[in-house]
């Protein structure tokens, strides 16, 4: 009979519904089961009549799933009430117990596994007998511990709900000298369990990082002939007016992020050293004026570039007369302002 029941359990496993989730590690579950309980090797003493060995069995269980391969379960089993009749005695036997087992499983897929449970059951067995000859009734009970072996298949219907088909065997439930029998029990059951903590945790979405400051670089070119007299580094009134117009655009500079660099350039007339010094003084004059208007002093700096980076190129190489050469090289005499940190600069001021 045991072989037949196990074969049925394996065959029915083929009809498992498609699962949606496998159990997670380190989670708890609880469930209940109902099935066919069959007693074996009953051998009631002084009974020569029929014994109803097939009964309804049920149980409840809870467990902890350590990982896909190992879990632990504790449960209560009602193994059923087995009546018997004989020419001498009529009576009944019932058994129940609390079991503790280790559950060893092997995943077939992410959602279906086979398993075995190994452990023990603390049971209580009760008998009630009526003597047909004397008319006397007698009640007895016994308690003890027996090994438990189980095997089955388990699959998930949803991430939280799982079903199992299981065959369980419990050996020697009772003392024949005390209650008149010592049967074994096989329980083929269908169970349903609820698994805690199976839902996917909502992902923690990090807030989008603040956009990086859009540091833009703007270039302004002011003609030195508008700002200064020839060969001088003192601002003319026209130059101050041009810088006033520029300041109206620079005033939106964020002092925490922005910076202004003023570059002074000269033409090639004169020595390198002289032109370097003149370019530095002119750049500093522009810086000083813009600071006086309100540009933070720690956000603006001056740099003299001398006669480097001429914009006229070779245009004036054939000009020999000094006045004409000075006029031809006028574009080289300039002040460039490089601004970082201003997003909206309208237009270049007219010099």
UniProtKB/Swiss-Prot annotation:
Pfam families: OmpA (PF00691), OmpA_membrane (PF01389). It is found in: Cell outer membrane. InterPro entries: Bact_OuterMem_StrucFunc, OMP/PagP_b-brl, OMP_bac, OmpA, OmpA-like, OMPA-like_CS, OmpA-like_sf, OmpA-like_TM_dom. Sequence repeats lie at residues 206-207, 208-209, 210-211, 212-213. CDD domains: OmpA_C-like. Residues 215-343 form the OmpA-like domain. The chain crosses the membrane at residues 27-37, 55-66, 70-78, 96-107, 112-120, 147-156, 161-168, 187-195. The extracellular loops are most variable in sequence, and in some bacteria confer sensitivity to phage and/or colicins. Belongs to the outer membrane OOP (TC 1.B.6) superfamily. OmpA family. This is Outer membrane protein A. It comes from Escherichia fergusonii (strain ATCC 35469 / DSM 13698 / CCUG 18766 / IAM 14443 / JCM 21226 / LMG 7866 / NBRC 102419 / NCTC 12128 / CDC 0568-73). The lineage of its organism: Bacteria, Pseudomonadati, Pseudomonadota, Gammaproteobacteria, Enterobacterales. The gene is ompA.
């Amino acid at each position: 009979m045991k072989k037949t029941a196990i074969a049925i359990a394996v065959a029915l496993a083929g009809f498992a519904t498609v699962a949606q989730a496998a159990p997670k590690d380190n989670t708890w579950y609880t469930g209940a089961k109902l099935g066919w309980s069959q007693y074996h090797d009953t051998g009631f003493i002084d009974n020569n009549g029929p014994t109803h060995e097939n009964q309804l069995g049920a149980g409840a269980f809870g467990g902890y799933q350590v990982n896909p391969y190992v879990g632990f379960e504790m449960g209560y089993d009602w193994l059923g009430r087995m009546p018997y009749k004989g020419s001498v005695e009529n009576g009944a036997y019932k058994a129940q117990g609390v079991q503790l087992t280790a559950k060893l499983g092997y995943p077939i897929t992410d959602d279906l596994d086979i398993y075995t449970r190994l452990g023990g059951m603390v049971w209580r067995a009760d008998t009630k007998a009526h003597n047909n000859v004397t008319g006397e009734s007698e009640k007895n009970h016994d308690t003890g511990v027996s090994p438990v072996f189980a095997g089955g298949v388990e699959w998930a219907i949803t991430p939280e709900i799982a079903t199992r088909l299981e065959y369980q065997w419990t050996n020697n439930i009772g003392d024949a000298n005390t209650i008149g029998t010592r049967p074994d029990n096989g329980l083929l059951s269908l169970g349903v369990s609820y698994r805690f903590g199976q839902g996917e945790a909502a992902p923690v979405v990090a807030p989008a990082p603040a956009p990086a400051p859009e540091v833009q670089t703007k270039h302004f070119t002011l003609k030195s002939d508008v700002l200064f007299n020839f060969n001088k580094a003192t601002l003319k009134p026209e130059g101050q007016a041009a810088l006033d117009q520029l300041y109206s655009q620079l005033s939106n500079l964020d002092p925490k992020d922005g910076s202004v660099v003023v570059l002074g350039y000269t033409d090639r007339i004169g020595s390198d050293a002289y032109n370097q010094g003149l370019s530095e003084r002119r750049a500093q004059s522009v810086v000083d004026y813009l600071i006086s208007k309100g540009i933070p002093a720690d956000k603006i700096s001056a740099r003299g570039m001398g006669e480097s980076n001429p914009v006229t190129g070779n245009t004036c190489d054939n000009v020999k007369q000094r006045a004409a050469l000075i006029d031809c090289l006028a574009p080289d005499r300039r002040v460039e302002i490089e601004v970082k940190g201003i997003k909206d600069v309208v237009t270049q001021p007219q010099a």
